[in-house]
Amino acid sequence: MSASTILVLDTEVKPDYRFLGPEIARHTPGETEYRAFVPDPEPPALEEYAGVVLSGSTASVYDRETHGEWLDPEFDLIRECIAEEIPLLGVCFGHQAVNAALGGEVVGDTRRATFVGMERTGEAPILDGVGAVVPVLHADVVTELGEGMVPTARTAYNEYFCSRHADAPVWTVQFHPEFTAAVRDEPSDWNPGEHGFDDTNSTRVFENFRDQVDRRQ
């Protein structure tokens, strides 16, 4: 492991659905370390990493009774990243977890597995160069941002589709930048609608995150 390693924490609860976490590691430039967090929620030594990415999950952040054994350590990790100013990227469930850990609200919504249109609403280097069409796989949405978080993008159905921390190097996206044609057949309910993968360049998010991490080295 080098001082520039980005840790990818996979928070998927279903082993046979852990196809997206490895894709995050694959699309993130530079050295990465992948770890399935749910089976072993031992807090990582954050000082050993240059940044952290929190993956999506079929779990819900508000289901603490079922998932508290690993959700509580994840929330602690999020708050530690903010306190220590360790670059953090939350993807889908990770977006929800960051906001929930900081006192925001996440609620159940319509299941979506398709491309959606995103509109930028605030400054966010993590979204630089990312087009408006992005893939989503989610059934929960953030309805109230966590303390210190500000909105950076919205959709027709959700005002807080992406966010960032006002002071710490923390960014979150509700969409799945790592979801590409390579894994399009994994979720059984995927329906691209009127768009195709040629219409999106959402993996750019990981290049932008690496750039932000490197700037802080």
Task: Specify the residue positions occupied by each region the protein language model found.
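Short amphipathic alpha-helical segments
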Residues: L20-P22, R64-H67, L102-G103, E147-G148, ...
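Catalytic metal-binding/acid-base residues of hydrolase active sites
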Residues: A36-V38, A59, G94, D140, ...
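Cysteine-nucleophile active-site neighborhood
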Residues: T58-A124
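Secondary-structure boundary/capping positions in well-ordered alpha/beta enzyme cores
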Residues: G30-T32, E84-L88, G104-E105, G148-T152
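Hydrophobic/aromatic beta-strand patches that form the interior of the parallel beta-sheet core
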Residues: L7-L9, R35, V53, L89, ...
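N-terminal beta1-alpha1 cap of cysteine-dependent amidohydrolase-like domains
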Residues: M1-P73, R79-I86, N191-Q217
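Pocket-forming structural segment of enzyme catalytic cores
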Residues: N99-W171, F175-T180
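C-terminal and late-domain segments of enzyme folds
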Residues: E159-Q217
